[in-house]
Amino acid sequence: MKKIAVLLAEGFEEGEALFVVDVLRRAGFQCNLVSINEEMVKGSHGIRVLVDKIISDEIKEYDMIVLPGGLPGATNLRDDERVIELVKYFDK
């Protein structure tokens, strides 16, 4: 089964993140919400989401990563060195 990590940071766009997770899980993929900081992440519209994991090197074992938009969520992802490293890793 393919493993997909949806990376979340404070201020993520709830629709972009949660719709993706919903569709992928319905399609039979293992899809985990992964935070760059806390177990509970607040979206750009104030909805708090409990994630499955906190970012770690284990994410490199996944088949794909998804980076939802939203502000300041996208900026927070962009500014995190671990996320930059993962994007470069998955770009190979």
Residue spans for each PLM region:
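Extended, subdomain-level signal for the structured scaffold at the beginning of enzyme domains
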Residues: 1-91
